[in-house]
A protein has these predicted regions:
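Short, well-ordered alpha-helix to beta-strand connector turns
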Residues: 12, 58, 80-81, 141
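Glycine-rich phosphate-binding loop at the start of an alpha helix
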Residues: 27, 41-48, 71-72, 129
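CoA-thioester-processing core
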Residues: 50, 70-123, 157
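Glycine-rich beta-to-alpha transition loops that act as phosphate-gripper elements at the mouths
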Residues: 64-70, 123-128
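Well-ordered beta-strand positions
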Residues: 82-84, 122, 126-128, 143, ...
């Protein structure tokens, strides 16, 4: 995905990120993470670099959250400029501590930027998982829509954000 972002013009437009139906992102491959400390370190480094690239991208990035967003998937949402989820029985949250894993400090700081103050403890240190409808209050999502309207709604938002003057995105 990082290579695709390199091909996006930095002076116009916007980007729309979507996952597969039912799963926006489940985060890191736990089999790879548990295979060796070196593999885990490389995966975390690559994941953080992707999140940072999205977070600092010079154009607006809209996330169409098509289902669950777990662990790195939740942090991916935190990296985007506007996040739209679908109604349904899906969960969003950072469950690393429940899996006896740590959240690397740079990723933690990125999440703290987007998550609301009343929910930072619950979302990050208590590893609370939120329903889609409840994910707006902590700051994982900006809005929720019907499943069949997700892509239409997200594309309209991406087109709208593409029309804005963008000096803030380039800072």
């Amino acid at each position: 995905f990082s290579e695709i972002l390199d091909q996006v013009p930095s002076d116009k437009g916007s980007v729309l990120i979507a996952g597969r139906e039912g799963m926006f992102s489940a985060g890191f491959d736990l089999k790879v993470m548990m295979s060796s400390p070196e593999n885990a370190a490389e995966m975390v480094k690559s994941g953080f670099n992707l999140l940072l690239k999205i977070f600092t991208f010079p154009r607006p990035i809209v996330a169409a959250c098509s289902g669950h967003a777990i662990a790195l998937g939740a942090f991916l949402l935190c990296s985007c400029d506007h996040r739209i989820g679908i109604k349904g029985d899906f969960k969003i949250g950072a469950n690393e501590l429940r899996n006896n894993m740590i959240i690397p400090t740079p990723i933690l700081e990125l999440a703290k930027f987007k998550l609301t103050k009343p929910h930072k403890q619950r979302a990050l240190l208590n590893a609370e998982m939120y329903s889609i409808e409840d994910a707006i209050a902590p700051g994982y999502l900006d809005e929720v829509t019907e499943h069949e309207k997700l892509m239409e709604h997200a594309l309209a938002k991406a087109k709208d954000l593409a029309t804005l003057a963008h000096p803030q995105y380039q800072q």
